[in-house]
Amino acid sequence: MNSPLLDKSLDFSTQIVLFYEAFSKSKKDTTIAKQLLRSATSIGANINEAVYGNSKADFISKLHISFKETGESIYWLTLLKRTNLTGYDFESLLALTEEIKRMLIASLNTAKENKRTPYVSQFYKRITSFLYPIDIKNCHLENVTV
């Protein structure tokens, strides 16, 4: 399923995992890289969880966690860049993190503005299709309330 936000967060996580794998083979301390790995992979995981939230509040909460994780990831990327422990150019990763952060801000603003509307509203369908496009009408799952 195509979703710009999920696709970008998955691309970001993949790049971080590959960076960590290469960096961990060096004899340098990997503490900072491990912190980056945790925060970076948490972004996409929480975006995906938001799609399957039990309520709008849960949806907003998971997106907010993803937003906070982008801030933490930016911190660790900036620290790695400034210390030059790796010799890796982090500009593209920082730019991708900023792009994901902007997308999350837009999604959170829309979600918060429409928080008082019924759970399955036009807004919710629009946002979830942006995050993880599925056809809710043709989704036949037992014991699942949408």
Protein language model features and the residues they cover:
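Short, C-terminally biased terminal segments at protein or domain edges
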Residues: 1-45, 49-146
